[in-house]
Regions:
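Short acidic-hydrophobic, aromatic-tinged amphipathic segments that line or gate anion-handling sites
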Residues: 140-141, 193
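Short, acidic loop-to-helix structural element flanking the phosphoryl-transfer center
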Residues: 142-162
Length: 196
C-alpha cells in the first residue's frame, strides 16, 4: 500500500493474490506464525503448485495448493464454506464451475485455491500424491489485460495477410473472450485445448 494505492513488486499473479488476501482479511499477510517447509513447484502438466507449511502455534501441518480450477476441482473431496468444511457434492461442483465460467467469460484469468492437513510423515517427504483429497477454498479471477499495443499489432498482421493464432495456458473461455476482444477470431470460433 503506497499512498492509498497498491503497488505490486515481483510476480503479478502472486501480487494479485496478496492484494486480494489483504483486502479480505486484516491479518492475511502475517505469515510470521507459519514456517515454510517445502514447495512442490508449478508444473505445466499438472497445472498447479503447492507449499507445505507448519503453523507454529499449533504445530498443524498444511499443504496449500493453487492452480487450474478444473484440476483442483477434480482433486478436491471437500469444500470450505465460511468456517465449515463439507463434502464437495455435485451441487457445489456445479456452483464452483459456474463461477469459473462466469469469470472466464469476463476474460478473467482464474486460479483455484485448496488445502489439506498433513501428517508429520507426509510433510517430511512431500510428493505430488499429496495433492489429492483437498478442501476447495475458492477461486480467484485476475484481470490480466493484453498489452495496449497488441490490438494494433493484430490489426496490422491481418492487413498484411498474416493469419494470427493465439496460444495460451488460460482457461478456454478466457482465451476465447480475449481473442474476440482483440479481433483475432469471431465470437463463434472453436477453441482447441491442449489435449485436443
Amino acid at each position: 500500500d503506497e499512498d492509498g494505492h497498491w503497488r505490486i513488486l515481483g510476480d503479478p499473479t502472486e501480487g494479485a493474490f496478496l492484494v486480494a488476501a489483504a483486502k479480505l482479511c486484516d491479518n492475511a499477510l502475517d505469515m510470521q506464525g507459519f514456517e515454510r517447509l517445502a514447495e512442490l513447484p508449478f508444473d505445466s502438466d499438472r497445472k498447479l503448485m503447492s507449499v507445505v507449511l507448519r503453523e507454529q502455534a499449533s504445530g498443524r501441518l498444511l499443504l496449500l495448493t493453487k492452480g487450474a480450477p478444473d484440476v483442483l476441482l477434480q482433486r478436491s473431496a471437500r469444500v470450505q464454506l465460511g468456517d465449515a468444511e463439507i463434502a464437495l457434492d455435485e451441487t457445489h461442483r456445479q456452483r464452483f464451475q459456474s463461477e469459473v465460467d462466469a469469470m472466464s467469460d469476463a476474460a478473467l484469468r482464474t486460479l483455484a485455491v485448496a488445502w489439506r492437513t498433513l501428517t508429520p510423515e507426509q510433510a517430511q517427504q512431500p510428493d505430488l500424491a499429496l495433492e489429492q483429497q483437498l478442501t476447495l477454498a475458492g477461486v480467484v479471477g485476475i484481470i490480466d489485460p493484453p498489452r495496449p499495443e497488441a490490438r494494433q499489432a493484430i490489426r496490422q498482421a491481418h492487413q498484411a495477410g498474416i493469419r494470427v493464432i493465439m496460444i495460451t495456458g488460460d482457461h478456454p473461455r478466457t482465451a476465447l473472450r480475449i481473442a474476440v476482444d482483440l479481433g483475432i477470431v469471431p465470437a463463434d470460433a472453436r477453441v482447441l485445448t491442449g489435449p485436443e
